Structure formats: C-alpha cells, structure tokens
Curated annotation (Swiss-Prot):
It comes from Methanothrix harundinacea (strain 6Ac). GO terms for biological process: translation. Keywords: Ribonucleoprotein, Ribosomal protein, RNA-binding, rRNA-binding. GO terms for cellular component: cytosolic large ribosomal subunit. Belongs to the universal ribosomal protein uL3 family. The keyword Transport does not apply. This is Large ribosomal subunit protein uL3. Part of the 50S ribosomal subunit. Forms a cluster with proteins L14 and L24e. Gene3D superfamilies: 3.30.1430.10, Ribosomal protein L3, domain 3, Translation factors. One of the primary rRNA binding proteins, it binds directly near the 3'-end of the 23S rRNA, where it nucleates assembly of the 50S subunit. GO terms for molecular function: rRNA binding; structural constituent of ribosome. PANTHER family: 60S RIBOSOMAL PROTEIN L3-RELATED, LARGE RIBOSOMAL SUBUNIT PROTEIN UL3. Residues 1-20 are annotated as: Disordered.
Amino acid sequence: MATIHRPRRGSLAFSPRKRAKSQVPRTRYWAAGEEKARMDGFAGYKAGMTHIIMIDDKPNSLTEGMEISVPVTILETPPLSIAALRVYEKYNGGVRAAGEAWSDKLDPSLARSITVPKNKRGAAIDEIGAIIEDMEELRLIAHTNPKLLTGVPKKNPDLMEIQVNGGNIANQFELAKSLLGSSVPISSIFSPGSIIDVSAITKGKGVQGPVKRWGINLQKRKHSRGGKRRHIGNLGPWNPHHVRWTVPLLGQMGYHQRTEFNKRVLAIGSDGGAITPDGGFPGYGIIRGEYAILSGSVPGPSKRLVRMRSAVRAKDADLKTPQVLYVSRDSKQGL
C-alpha cells in the first residue's frame, strides 16, 4: 500500500518567506555580560572564501595536534565609528528608549544615511548620567565606513545598535562615554579564538517554484501528462474555503535574514595583501585594510554586510589561540 503519512516538505519556522526590510541585520538577543563592561558586537563586509592549514586543537579529536585544512570566510572589517549612545528603561514587560546622546564629532558621510540630529552631546549626556541608575540597557549607535573600502561600491554608512554588556549600568555608561565619537577596531572587540555568531541577509533568488523553494517531490511521470510536473498535487480541502498558509507554493526565495551560531575567529590582521588571492576575490577585489578570518561559511554574497556578536550558545569556548600555518592565496578566478 501507499504510505499514508509523511512529514511536510520544508520548514514553516521562517514564514512568511519574504524579502528582508533592510540589508542591515537586526540583533534581538545578546550574550550574558562578563564582569567587565565591553562593547559586544562588530560588523564587516564579506570578501569571499578560501582555505587555511592549521593545527587541530580540538580536544579528543582524531586529528588533534595534526595539520588540517579548514574552509574559511574572509571579512574586511574597517573600524566602526561610534556616533551616539542610547539608554533603555523597563516598560510593559520589555524595554523602550529613554534617551540618547550624540557625539560632537560625527562623520560627514553619516548625513548620507540619516538626518543628523541637531542636539549634540553636552546637556544630553548629563541628563542621561542623572538617570543612568534607573536604566535597564545601554547600546551604542555605530556605523560602518565603506568609503575606506575598494571592494564595496558605496559610500553610505550602515547604521546599527550594539549593546554594551558586563559590569553594572554605571560601568557601561562610563565605557560608552569614552567611546563616543571614536573609531573602534575589531581587534579591541574580538581576538583569535573567540566564538561568535554571525548574521546577514542571504543571497536573493527571486521568485522560485515550490520544488526548489520547499523541496516537494516532482509529480510522477504518468501524472505529469496533464502538463505540469513541478507543482503540488493538492491545494487543500474544500473547507475552509481558502488556501492555507502552510501549503507550499511558489514565491520569494532568498534575501532573508539568517543567523549562524558558533563561528570561530581564526585570525585578525591589518595586512590584507597577505591573504588576498591572486587576482583578488571574485566580485570583491583586493583587501586593503583590517580583516577577520572566520571558520566555515557565512550567509550572503560578497560585499554583503555581516554582523558579529559574542556567541549566545558558546561551545568549545576554552580553545586556545589558533595556530594558522598557511592561508591559501591560489587564484579563485574561474572556480
């Protein structure tokens, strides 16, 4: 007999599958803070992938202490500029913004992305200092500097909020005041060996049919004589008189926000020429500034903004600094 039951094709966890509102991913959750206050995130632009040779330092691994080849992603990470700080208070089971203070030294390129507030640091920072003990969270408003990159063809900075974790709210406020108006390099946030999460907007695929979008089976050869093979055989019951949202249909595929957990930072450096492959990264070009090497792949195409944060489900957090022996610079052209 035919099988009566089978699991549904595709996951409903990410519905509705529509295009992301912005290319800047949203971070809704942050890792628990440590004893010392620190800025808990960063952002960079994806250049491409290559592979490295490193010493396997994972305990009890079959290749522990041996040389292994690891696929890696290269992110170009120019310093982030801290434009403002914002505090949040408890409200209705969550938090809401209670005040913000902007730097006196804003980058002129910021006016390309937003209307720059007229009120500056002075009185606002004092007002926040007076109520800081009653606040719940403190976040920094930072922006990227794509004008420093040759591989990203834009000048408009990407604006985002980055939470300050650790210590108490007063310690966080003092740290935020010291960072306001400054440029923060990635080396002051993460170090080789750090375990992080990455968020980005995936590659857009446009409108795709249900076979590619949901993974349903093709119609059998005999059933396809009606003229259709790459479609579902049933839209649902007579009642209710509408097509349910769970039915796999054609529609937008890709260009969704996705977060991948537990990526390991294998190296951080400032000499991009030492890791750029011959001929440059396809679709990106040459890395000229600071960079980070992450294990595995990250969502999105080249040139896409990638946000990083401390891992919220950290594994293997006790690993030592990675021993990277070789970074492949073989040409990626034609691959």
